[in-house]
Amino acid sequence: MTSNREAVMAGNMIRVTSRDGFELDAWHVKPAGPRKGGVIVIQEIFGLSDHIRKMAERFGAAGFEAIAPSMYDRAEPGFIVQPRDVAAGMARGVALATGNGPDNALNDMGGVFDMLKAAGKVCITGYCYGGTMSWLAAARLDGLSAASCYYGGNIAQMLGLRPQCPTICHFGAKDAHIPLVGAVDRIEAAHPDVPVYIYDAGHGFARKDSTDHDAASDRLAFERTLELFGRAG
């Protein structure tokens, strides 16, 4: 279910000091060309997987310095669910996400923010669990320039949190986990100033190793994210 983190891609592993002093691993990608800013990339429930590393590298290729922290390191360092083990690993991933809690997550995301902010603006994005954490950060992590939240299943449970930076959300119309009626519509009603984009796709449409991957939706959501991050102050 888990694997060692092998440096097989364009980035490298670094250590990040959380705001409460805890040290965690993170995948770091330098920008290609002139630096446009920093991006915090928050994982799904499956850990700091190859998919999340590749998403960080995607932002690096677009000119951003990207850091993807390993959000479960406090409880189970190195936890990664491989694509073939998604069904078996999902329950453990959910348990780790729940056990980590919002305060630990904010401290860890804050530590990454502190690493990136010296060189300019910092934006955040995340997927599934990371989409919810990106919403949390947009509301409670001071100084962020923008947030792009992908299919965050628990955003609808955090409607009292108001993003303090420009924020957009992405959801799939065919997402069996996040219904348009009863979840997404509640987000739209509570936060009419937050653009909510609906795609003809399922949950995890940006994950290339998922059966729900939808290339057109993935591409459009990424373009919208880059546009937001590019104009953010």
Sequence positions of predicted segments:
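N-terminal cap/leader regions of alpha/beta-hydrolase-fold enzymes
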Residues: M1-G233
